[in-house]
């Protein structure tokens, strides 16, 4: 689906022929804060399929059969190959992202706001404390499954979404975003990336991993410099 469709219509952007996330039960109008999660919410509530997945316009799952040096569009996994993988697993994820010199916790607070995670942890402790050990373990690690990319059996995805949005909607009500930039206000998308592994670990869910195809040019030098700058010269937070 086309995420943020309600805002596209409001801002008079031309239609491009995709199903919007503003049909049926939806939270499309909250896309500025929830990012691709408005599409995930829409899919969980409006699609009747055995498996449901989410990728991005600039990130796709890669075929295991194609060379890393093949043209990017040719490296995107085919329907047939993905189905063959799903015949042996209920969940497909991107390979873990490794920070090496940062934990998942320190990477987040150096890039965003510490209060986001403080509030999130308090909500988990209050609403579903059985997830707290896995959440804390994930935050202490230097790697994890990020990007909000996955394919899941529908029943699992609905379970995940019920749990995820229950936390995020409480966070939306409780979080003070005074002084947040436009990027900071995408907080619920950022936080959700840090919740997936806690859900997987607590529910003992197995999965398969795939590489990612980046459709846009990746300036790794710029990304690495920004990463180090955030670590050694973090912005002040409350």
Predicted segments, located by residue:
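Short, small-residue-biased leader/transition segments that mark boundaries at the very start
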Residues: 2-9
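Active-site-proximal specificity loops/subdomain of glycosyltransferases
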Residues: 10-46
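A solvent-exposed, charged loop/short amphipathic helix patch at secondary-structure junctions
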Residues: 13-24, 66-72, 165-182
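Short aromatic/hydrophobic "clamp" motif used to bind/position activated sugar donors
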Residues: 52-54
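Short acidic donor-binding/metal-coordinating loop in glycosyltransferase active sites
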Residues: 56-59
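Conserved donor-nucleotide/metal-binding helix-loop-beta segment in metal-dependent transferases, i.e.
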Residues: 62-116
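Catalytic core and acceptor-binding pocket of nucleotide-sugar-dependent glycosyltransferases
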Residues: 120-219
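Membrane-proximal basic amphipathic "stem/tether" segments
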Residues: 216-238
């Amino acid at each position: 689906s086309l995420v943020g469709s309600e805002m596209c219509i409001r801002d008079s952007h031309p239609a491009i022929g995709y199903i919007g996330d503003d049909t049926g039960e939806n939270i499309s109008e909250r896309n500025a804060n929830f990012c691709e999660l408005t599409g995930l919410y829409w899919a969980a509530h409006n699609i009747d399929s055995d498996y449901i997945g989410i990728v991005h316009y600039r990130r796709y799952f890669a075929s295991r059969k194609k060379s890393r040096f093949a043209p990017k569009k040719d490296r995107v996994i085919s329907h047939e190959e993905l189905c063959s993988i799903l015949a042996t697993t209920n969940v497909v994820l991107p390979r873990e992202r490794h920070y090496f010199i940062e934990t998942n916790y320190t990477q987040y607070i150096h890039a965003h706001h510490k209060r986001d995670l403080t509030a999130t942890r308090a909500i988990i402790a209050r609403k579903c404390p059985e997830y707290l050990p896995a959440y804390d373990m994930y935050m202490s690690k230097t790697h994890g499954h990020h990007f909000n990319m996955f394919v899941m059996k529908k029943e699992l995805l609905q379970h995940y979404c019920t749990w995820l949005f229950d936390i995020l909607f409480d966070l939306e009500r409780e979080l003070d975003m005074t002084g947040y930039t436009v990027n900071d206000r995408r907080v619920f998308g950022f936080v959700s990336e840090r919740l997936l592994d806690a859900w997987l670990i607590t529910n003992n869910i197995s999965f398969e991993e795939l590489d990612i195809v980046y459709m846009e040019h990746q300036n790794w030098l710029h990304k690495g410099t920004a990463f180090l700058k955030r670590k050694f010269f973090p912005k002040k937070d409350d």
